[in-house]
Amino acid sequence: MVDRSDNAAESFDDAVEERVINEEYKIWKKNTPFLYDLVMTHALEWPSLTAQWLPDVTKQDGKDYSVHRLILGTHTSDEQNHLLIASVQLPSEDAQFDGSHYDNEKGEFGGFGSVCGKIEIEIKINHEGEVNRARYMPQNACVIATKTPSSDVLVFDYTKHPSKPEPSGECQPDLRLRGHQKEGYGLSWNPNLNGYLLSASDDHTICLWDINATPKEHRVIDAKNIFTGHTAVVEDVAWHLLHESLFGSVADDQKLMIWDTRNNNTSKPSHTVDAHTAEVNCLSFNPYSEFILATGSADKTVALWDLRNLKLKLHSFESHKDEIFQVQWSPHNETILASSGTDRRLHVWDLSKIGEEQSTEDAEDGPPELLFIHGGHTAKISDFSWNPNEPWIICSVSEDNIMQVWQMAENVYNDEEPEIPASELETNTA
């Protein structure tokens, strides 16, 4: 028998939480002109679990914007799923976000973010089930690998598919990669070895494929190696950015493992670290400093590591209120890192500020290394991506279909005082 009082209490809690989330969002929206140089919000037809900027950018003469592209996916309710390529028009320096266009009726600001900012889905490719994650191959950005709800990893060359999907819904990947027994999320292309792809799975393993190998019938390629060191769900995997044979993996066994493909032992990593006090969901190698990496965990912290001494955690970033599912270093700044997750927030951190003195008032907002909190999402953030061409621009996607493309105000990262007096900034006193 169901206890009705429990159900009533639960729905009351949900209603209260929803009210708090909505209040926080209204306050965030009012403050956007002071906190951001750009905010574009786009409601997708279906939520995307994945987001990655493609490396190319098109600038057109006489236009005050450039066109960038994004890889997205769908997570539908029993309808046909698709791998998506979207185009995004980003304003040039001289097309400034104008905070003066406040629309009292709508309670929001006009300016670039809502007027000229165009986001369009350009290519739709039929996909088997939702797209858990999609990542392009660095050596040829037309080649995209995807994680499916089955054990297969699919590879698509989007130039070989029509931009409108076949109405039959048939999914025709250019390659089908076999080796896993279950689905997963982690996916990483080797930036130094063309066609080498790693995948992490709920089956506790990591598979490595060489997509240049000769496929069997039905375009199937079997895993070249299967790494079996973890004892629980492997959440994420990442190649080192400089050393072609090194990669890292993290799992629900709370461990970070560093592997070297030159070692023939696929069950024993080179290094194993008890990284967190709960599941480890994500990792990212620093693009500028070859020894530095970060991991994010269900213990609500991001940890900083040095490959030369993994026994010692360099730092723990603490400010998130729930599980962390994604962590990514900025492609433009060695000391800048972002993390996101279940608490609906994306935090941007600056390592160079660790240990700086703070006033008591500032300390209440978070540690000195917490540079910025993006509060524009009202549901769990599934994925985010730093734009490789425009510094400080991030695309983030959440479970409620919302995609945001945004850039924090320049005075935040340049350490200048904002032009607006603090008394005019609305704060959340709830």
Swiss-Prot record:
Identify the keywords attached in UniProt to this record, alphabetized. Chromatin regulator, Nucleus, Phosphoprotein, Repeat, Repressor, Transcription, Transcription regulation, WD repeat
Q: Does the keyword Transit peptide apply?
A: no
Subcellular location(s) per record: Nucleus
> Which residues get modified to Phosphoserine?
11, 100
User: Pfam families this protein is in?
Assistant: CAF1C_H4-bd, WD40
Any one of the GO CC terms: Sin3-type complex
Recorded GO molecular functions are: histone binding; histone deacetylase binding; protein homodimerization activity; transcription cis-regulatory region binding
Each WD repeat, start to end = 126-159, 179-210, 229-260, 275-306, 319-350, 376-407
Checking InterPro entries in the record gives: G-protein_beta_WD-40_rep, Histone-bd_RBBP4-like_N, WD40/YVTN_repeat-like_dom_sf, WD40_repeat_CS, WD40_repeat_dom_sf, WD40_rpt, WD_repeat_RBAP46/RBAP48/MSI1
| Swiss-Prot/TrEMBL GO biological process terms | chromatin organization; chromatin remodeling; DNA replication-dependent chromatin assembly; eggshell chorion gene amplification; facultative heterochromatin formation; heterochromatin formation; negative regulation of DNA-templated transcription; negative regulation of transcription by RNA polymerase II
Q: List the disulfide bonds.
A: none
User: Would you say which domain of life the source belongs to?
Assistant: Eukaryota
Q: Does the keyword Repressor apply?
A: yes
Please give the chief subcellular localization of this protein.
Answer: nucleus
Q: How does it assemble?
A: Probably binds directly to helix 1 of the histone fold of histone H4, a region that is not accessible when H4 is in chromatin. Self associates. Associates with chromatin. Component of the CAF-1 complex, composed of Caf1-55, Caf1-105 and Caf1-180; within the CAF-1 complex, Caf1-180 interacts directly with both Caf1-55 and Caf1-105. Component of the NuRD complex, composed of at least Caf1-55, Mi-2, MTA1-like and HDAC1/Rpd3. Within the NuRD complex, Caf1-55 may interact directly with Mi-2, MTA1-like and HDAC1/Rpd3.
Role of this protein: Core histone-binding subunit that may target chromatin assembly factors, chromatin remodeling factors and histone deacetylases to their histone substrates in a manner that is regulated by nucleosomal DNA. Component of several complexes which regulate chromatin metabolism.
What family does the entry list? Belongs to the WD repeat RBAP46/RBAP48/MSI1 family.
Q: What protein name applies here? A: Chromatin assembly factor 1 p55 subunit
